[in-house]
């Protein structure tokens, strides 16, 4: 056992005190005022601390029946923070088609729970079909059938029937994001658009095309409308 001289004890205490003062001090950012619950959950040092920020059992329930926002992500449902997942539940009206879109931070697992849904998905540029053209993957889904849209792939869903279709989508991120291809493409400058389309859209027509792009979440399919005797309108 080592023996420490009494004369060295004050020096040792001073040294330890200076080390303690120099050591990083924990600041509880998880309770910082003005931050959203999601932001505080992100700042929590451990998963255990995140649970303390969600003290009620109701914090772990997201009710798709009552919410106006059919997508659960870490903003709308903070309990998802750190899980790496999100979900959406939705209804596609008769003859409805979602905009061609992509999710920049997640793959989507899409399951039909009622009705019928046709899907089209375009993977990355170098994925070609047997003829050397861009491959387009098309599916015809019934109840309890699923497809996958890889992260960043262009895709759309169409209800070709006269009754609503319902589906559930799971995402591999708690912040999947969405990009709508047509409206974002035509947000570029006129010169870029004209050159991108090889001059097939004249400069004077670009604003007309921009204005024609629907702004709602889904659009109607003309052929289906005629079959079902429905009136065309954005939905």
Which positions does each model-derived feature cover?
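Glycine- and acidic-residue-biased ligand/ion/polar-headgroup-sensing regions
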Residues: 94, 103-129
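Short, conserved secondary-structure segments in the cores of folded domains
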Residues: 88, 98-100, 108, 137
């Amino acid at each position: 056992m080592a023996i420490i001289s009494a004369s060295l004890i004050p020096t040792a205490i001073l040294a330890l005190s200076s080390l303690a003062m120099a050591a990083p001090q924990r600041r509880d950012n998880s309770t910082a005022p003005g931050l959203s619950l999601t932001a505080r959950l992100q700042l929590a040092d451990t998963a255990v601390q995140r649970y303390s920020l969600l003290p009620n059992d109701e914090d772990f329930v997201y009710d798709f029946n009552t919410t106006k926002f059919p997508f659960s992500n870490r903003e709308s449902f903070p309990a998802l923070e750190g899980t790496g997942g999100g979900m959406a539940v939705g209804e596609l009206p008769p003859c409805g088609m979602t905009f061609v879109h992509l999710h920049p931070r997640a793959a989507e697992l899409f399951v039909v729970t009622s009705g019928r849904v046709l899907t089209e998905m375009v993977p990355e540029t170098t994925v070609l079909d047997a003829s050397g053209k861009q491959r387009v993957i098309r599916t015809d889904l019934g109840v309890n059938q699923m497809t996958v849209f890889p992260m960043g792939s262009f895709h759309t869903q169409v209800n070709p029937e006269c009754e609503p279709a319902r589906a559930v989508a799971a995402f591999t991120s708690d912040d999947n994001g969405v990009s709508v291809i047509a409206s974002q493409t035509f947000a570029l400058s006129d010169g870029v658009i004209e050159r991108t389309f090889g001059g097939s859209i004249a400069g004077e027509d670009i604003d007309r095309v921009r204005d024609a792009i629907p702004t709602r979440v889904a659009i109607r399919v003309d052929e289906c409308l005629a079959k079902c005797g429905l009136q065309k309108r954005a939905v």
